[in-house]
Amino acid sequence: VEVYLDDAPLDIDAPDGSSLEQLTQQVSRRLRGTGRVITAVRCDGRTVPADELECTLARPAREYGSIEFQSSEVAGLVRAAMQEAGRLFIESDRLRHKAADLLNEAKSSRAMELLGQCFRIWSQVYETVLKGAQLRQVNLLAVDVPDVDVTAWLGLLADRLREVKGALEVGDHVLLADLLRYEFDDVSEQWKRLLGHLADG
């Protein structure tokens, strides 16, 4: 099997019977200390899609005539991910305020739809932050972000979410609207500062 990394031939020891996953691990070890990670795999000229990756990695490497690995700089990947997360968070602010307006207009069904979108965005952004920190080998609790105490901010976020849950459970839409409009602005601004800090690296 011919192995390439970023279009350059790669001399690598692949014992008979090695799986594509084992070969990928060897290539990943070669990249240690370079600030790069594998971001795509092509087998016989075909890029392996994400939904086929697990199955393909389990197959013997010898089934393919050529295996090409593409790598990218970690810094660039994290920067792009954090910038996109920041855009999503701005959208969540818009949805949050719109949901509050709808609650005040007694349009609770539509408001709940928008609130659900907010929760999905927050969850997505949270996962993005965790993965970005992992790629950069950063301890989030030790991150030095100007004007942001990360530990206190996480506690504040948890408190606000508990308050929203409580308002939802008792059906207090007036309280829920006030929480969405006024009590998440500080949390949101600190989210954005953290995302900007991780993007700048």
Regions found by a protein language model. Name each.
Residues 2-201:
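C-terminal-biased regions
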